[in-house]
């Protein structure tokens, strides 16, 4: 269980935040405490690929996996652990830091969502999530259009995550899912990219509908 976005809220007020059920507790209630290994890290909090990782599991699973981890490394990067502790200090320090992330990300998400609603709302050619956290907007096109949309956007200069990237081996049976990642570009570039994207959605959808 990849718990990568446990503190990645876009809004400060708790009523505007999403919280998942604690899966380890639910597994124990269901009589299957050993079903899940839960992983998290500060990779999307401090340093991508160079953060601090953590593993949560049942006592039996932790006892088992320690045998393998002990062989894999005889010493963790304690200096990296120390600098994280000194910087964040405690959980409140993590939350305070993530509010700074949210202040950067929130306007980007809201702009993309507003563009999607203005240009595609009510047309019946696309649906999308309005996430309260994390790094992605999930977009559902008409069946058979996702790869076409991403390819058209690339031709126009907007490089997106490959269509179907969220599916095992990238194979989306309906060819309809596109993962929009608004986090990286400056908002000025993102505005242009969002306009290109909605035009590509319209063009690909019209081509599909005319061919039917």
Model-inferred region functions:
Residues 1-3, 40, 54-56, 129-130, ...:
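Short beta-strand segments
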Residues 1-17:
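Catalytic PLP-binding core of fold-type I/II PLP enzymes
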Residues 25-106:
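Conserved core segment of the aminotransferase class I/II
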Residues 31-32, 155, 170-212:
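PLP-dependent enzyme catalytic core of the Aspartate aminotransferase-like
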Residues 40-43, 125-126, 164-169:
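Short, solvent-exposed loop/turn elements at beta->coil junctions and helix N-caps
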Residues 99-113, 125-140:
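Conserved glycine-rich beta-strand-loop-beta hairpin in the small C-terminal domain of fold type I
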Residues 142-146, 185-187:
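Helix N-cap motif at beta-to-alpha junctions
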Residues 159:
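Residue-level detector of anion-binding/catalytic polar loops
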């Amino acid at each position: 269980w990849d718990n990568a976005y446990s503190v990645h809220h876009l809004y400060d007020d708790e009523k505007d935040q999403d919280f998942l059920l604690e899966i380890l507790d639910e597994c124990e209630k269901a009589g299957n405490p050993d079903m899940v290994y839960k992983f998290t890290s500060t990779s999307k909090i401090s340093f991508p690929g160079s953060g601090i990782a953590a593993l949560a599991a049942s006592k039996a699973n932790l006892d088992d996996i320690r045998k393998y981890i002990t062989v894999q490394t005889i010493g963790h990067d304690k200096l990296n652990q120390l600098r994280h502790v000194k910087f964040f200090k405690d959980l409140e320090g993590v939350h305070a830091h993530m509010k700074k992330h949210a202040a950067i990300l929130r306007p980007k998400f809201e702009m993309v969502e507003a563009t999607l609603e203005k240009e595609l709302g009510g047309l019946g050619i696309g649906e999308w999530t309005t996430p309260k956290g994390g790094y992605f907007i999930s977009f559902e096109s008409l069946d058979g259009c996702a790869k076409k949309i991403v390819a058209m956007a690339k031709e126009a200069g907007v490089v997106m995550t490959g269509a179907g990237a969220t599916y095992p081996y990238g194979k989306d049976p309906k060819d309809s899912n596109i993962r929009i990642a608004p986090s990286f570009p400056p908002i000025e570039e993102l505005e242009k990219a969002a306009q290109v994207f909605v035009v590509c959605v319209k063009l690909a959808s019209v081509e599909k509908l005319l061919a039917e």
